[in-house]
């Protein structure tokens, strides 16, 4: 049985912040969808291109997942140590016919806690940022490829301050291609800052900064009461995870005997036609791949849109599928 603190699990995983999180107060939510719109496809391609300048990559599928205002699990006694602290972060999986990349995004002030109580042994354990293929083999099973890039307070706290793709808060990993024969390959582009500590962007590189749509599987707007206020403009959101190694170095600690290539299958979700929402609403969410709004919909006329692992809820602006 897997629980945080025992990474890697026996199943395949992509973990931008693996920890016991709590949504019972109704404020934290998880949103996910596959988006094939040209705008989202282009934005994902540009993030990958920024991290891997030598690669020509044009995704055919992009899956976007947002964890918004997640609270830490406080243990059986409801510990108040992390009371009021919330984490918001994103994972984007971009795939073509020959390769796959994971993009992790961490906004300013997006990570406010770094450890949680474990629901298994009631001890505090640090979150983990990593990847695993899970068990493999037939008669004799063993751990497949797995890589851990952050698993202590210092490296996790640095996720929103550093980068391996040259843009603060953005971390890019190649997770499926011939190049990953010995494991996940992280990007290796230094984060340049000027004398004032601000991000420095290459003059000849124009990263797409338009507000792109992030929605749940039902393609409805994010509930109006949920977004946390106080986040900066979305194009300043990308501040990325700091692995346990220095950002200027390759991860020498990846175990070569246990890391093997794996390709992430991308599951198809129901498609909608997103429209970009008002910028003011985007600025409240603090995410890069922002939310979209469509025509008014209700649970009653969209009975089969939600996953079997989600429940449908109606809001004033439409319905959404909430993970359970």
Curated annotation (Swiss-Prot):
Domain spans labelled EGF-like: 295-324
One Gene Ontology term from the biological process aspect of the record: positive regulation of cell-substrate adhesion
Ranges of residues in domain NIDO: 16-178
InterPro entries: Epithelial_Barrier/Signaling, NIDO_dom
Positions bearing carbohydrate: 97
Post-translational changes noted in the entry: N- and O-glycosylated.
Keyword Nucleus on entry: no
Ranges of Basic and acidic residues composition bias in the record: 247-259
Region (Disordered): 219-259
One cellular-component annotation, GO: basement membrane
Highest rank taxon of the organism: Eukaryota
Residues modified to Sulfotyrosine: 200, 205
Major location (coarse): secreted
Hydrolase in keyword set: no
Compartments, as annotated in UniProt: Secreted, Extracellular space, Extracellular matrix, Basement membrane
Disulfide bonds: 299-312, 306-321
Function: Sulfated glycoprotein widely distributed in basement membranes and tightly associated with laminin. Also binds to collagen IV and perlecan. It probably has a role in cell-extracellular matrix interactions.
Summary of subunit composition and partner proteins: Interacts with FBLN1. Interacts with LGALS3BP. Interacts with PLXDC1. Interacts with SVEP1.
Official protein name in the record: Nidogen-1
